[in-house]
Amino acid sequence: MAVGKNKRLSKGKKGLKKRTVDPFSRKDEYSVKAPSTFQIRDVGKTLVNRTTGLKNANDSLKGRIFEVSLADLQNDEDHAFRKVKLRVDEVQGKNCLTNFHGLDFTSDKLRSLVRKWQSLIEANVTVKTTDDYLLRLFAIAFTKRRPNQIKKTTYAGSSQIRAIRKKMTEIIQREAASCTLSQLTTKLIPEVIGREIEKSTQGIYPLQNVHIRKVKLLKSPKFDLGALLNLHGESTTDDQGHKVEREFKETVLESV
């Protein structure tokens, strides 16, 4: 018999259920808000552990990245193949204020674009916006048949591909470097840059399915709360005056 053990002591009964605590009882629900550049502002809900001791719930929420379909943000099924990344930058009450963090295509859409008998042309550009966001934009384009073309294939020559890629790079650089991140987002939603590339390269070789397939955020500037609140249509101070309901009339005293 080992030293320190007493056989007469009754052991605890095995198989007794431990008291289970519902983990969701310790969590709070927060609303995720998209910037005002999108039509639908309410992205959804997210859960986080309540503030206990030194662990602050707001710190756990900041930096969270949500991937949302652009179709849900714009209420338009035509954008279903594009995914937008939103990053939580600030927490106001029970609302998580997000900012644009990137854009991507769904893999099934990319695979459906690649076909036989055509050339695929890709380009990527690293550009800085006017509000100091460093982004990398990836463009994709495909050649198409010329009007009245009999030949089955639409392969572009290597010199034509180089010329098209150069033109793509110039247009992306010009369009992205001359605007803020929110203005660039408004250009990406209706695919303004893709249409501009398609129009300007008609003289080199006709293109189709020209898209900015991916936007990657490389570096963000120092966090500015005022800029984020303006992006969400809010403000830290009420600078706007209130409209007066009726015309003000000065009262004239008859006697002093």
Swiss-Prot record:
Keywords: Acetylation, Cytoplasm, Ribonucleoprotein, Ribosomal protein. The modification N-acetylalanine is found at A2. It is found in: Cytoplasm. Residues 1-20 are annotated as: Disordered. GO terms for cellular component: cytosolic small ribosomal subunit. The keyword Iron does not apply. GO terms for molecular function: structural constituent of ribosome. Pfam families: Ribosomal_S3Ae. Residues 1-18 have a biased composition (Basic residues). GO terms for biological process: translation. Component of the small ribosomal subunit. Mature ribosomes consist of a small (40S) and a large (60S) subunit. The 40S subunit contains about 33 different proteins and 1 molecule of RNA (18S). The 60S subunit contains about 49 different proteins and 3 molecules of RNA (25S, 5.8S and 5S). Belongs to the eukaryotic ribosomal protein eS1 family. This is Small ribosomal subunit protein eS1. It comes from Talaromyces marneffei (strain ATCC 18224 / CBS 334.59 / QM 7333).
